[in-house]
C-alpha cells in the first residue's frame, strides 16, 4: 500500500517535497538528500507526518 508523505528539511524545517512510499517495504522514516531552495544547496530531508 503506497501512502503520500512530505519531506521536511532538517536544517530549515521547510516542507519542500511530497512523494509516495510503500509502507510494507519501508516501515521506517524515509531520509533523502534533496535540494533546499532557501539554502540553495542539497540537505537531508526527512519524512514528516
UniProtKB/Swiss-Prot annotation:
Record PROSITE patterns: RIBOSOMAL_L33
- Which GO molecular-function terms appear in the entry? structural constituent of ribosome
Q: Name one GO cellular component term.
A: ribonucleoprotein complex
Keyword check for Aminoacyl-tRNA synthetase: no
Gene3D superfamilies named in the record: Ribosomal protein L33 (2.20.28.120)
**By its UniProt entry, which Pfam families does this protein fall under?**
Ribosomal_L33
Keywords annotated in UniProt: Ribonucleoprotein, Ribosomal protein
Work out whether the entry's keyword set contains Ribosomal protein: yes
Which InterPro entries does this UniProt record tie to the protein? Answer: Ribosomal_bL33, Ribosomal_bL33_CS, Ribosomal_bL33_sf, Ribosomal_zn-bd
Q: Which GO terms describe its biological process?
A: translation
Q: Which family does it belong to?
A: Belongs to the bacterial ribosomal protein bL33 family.
Cited NCBIfam families: PRK00504.1, PRK00595.1, rpmG_bact
* Stored HAMAP family: Ribosomal_bL33 (MF_00294)
Name by which UniProt lists this protein: Large ribosomal subunit protein bL33B
Provide the organism lineage as a comma list. Bacteria, Bacillati, Bacillota, Bacilli, Bacillales
Amino acid at each position: 500500500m503506497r501512502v503520500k508523505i512530505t519531506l521536511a528539511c532538517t536544517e530549515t524545517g521547510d516542507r519542500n517535497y511530497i512523494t509516495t512510499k510503500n509502507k510494507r517495504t519501508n516501515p521506517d522514516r524515509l531520509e533523502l538528500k534533496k535540494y533546499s531552495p532557501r539554502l540553495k544547496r542539497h540537505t537531508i530531508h526527512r519524512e514528516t507526518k
